Amino acid sequence: MNGQNIRIRLKAFDHRILDASTKEIVSTARRTGAQIRGPIPLPTHIEKFTVNRSPHIDKKSREQFEMRTHKRVLDIVDPTPQTVDALMKLDLAAGVDVEIKL
């Protein structure tokens, strides 16, 4: 696969699971002889929600919740066919969203 790069974007709510999955992908790619750029941490997307504490009165009494989405990017430079096969067979943790672009 000369001249091609594989870009892998990972998203998760828990950064520990995300880092473990990233390490697993990096070790698999290095074992098959591919070069890796990254992991590059992307900005964390924070989504905040504000709701009333009480359903009837006290408009000033509110509660805030937030949802953080952590992201990482990996580039695999000049992958071998063994690298692609190993990445397809890889079983990552639940809760990690993986996008692969060739």
Swiss-Prot record:
The processes (GO biological process) annotated in the record are: translation
InterPro entries hit by this protein: Ribosomal_uS10, Ribosomal_uS10_CS, Ribosomal_uS10_dom, Ribosomal_uS10_dom_sf
Q: Which organism is it from?
A: Methylorubrum extorquens (strain PA1) (Methylobacterium extorquens)
Subunit structure of this chain's protein? Part of the 30S ribosomal subunit.
Q: Which UniProt keywords apply?
A: Ribonucleoprotein, Ribosomal protein
Picking any one GO molecular function of the record gives: tRNA binding
Q: Which gene encodes it?
A: rpsJ
- Which family does the entry's similarity section mention? Belongs to the universal ribosomal protein uS10 family.
Q: What is this protein called?
A: Small ribosomal subunit protein uS10
Please provide an example of a Pfam family that matches this protein in its UniProt record: Ribosomal_S10
Which purpose does this protein serve, as stated in its record? Answer: Involved in the binding of tRNA to the ribosomes.
Task: Give start-end of the signal peptide.
Answer: none
Is Transcription regulation among the key words of this record? no
Q: Does the keyword Ribosomal protein apply?
A: yes
| GO cellular component term of the entry, any | ribonucleoprotein complex
Note the superkingdom of the native organism. Answer: Bacteria
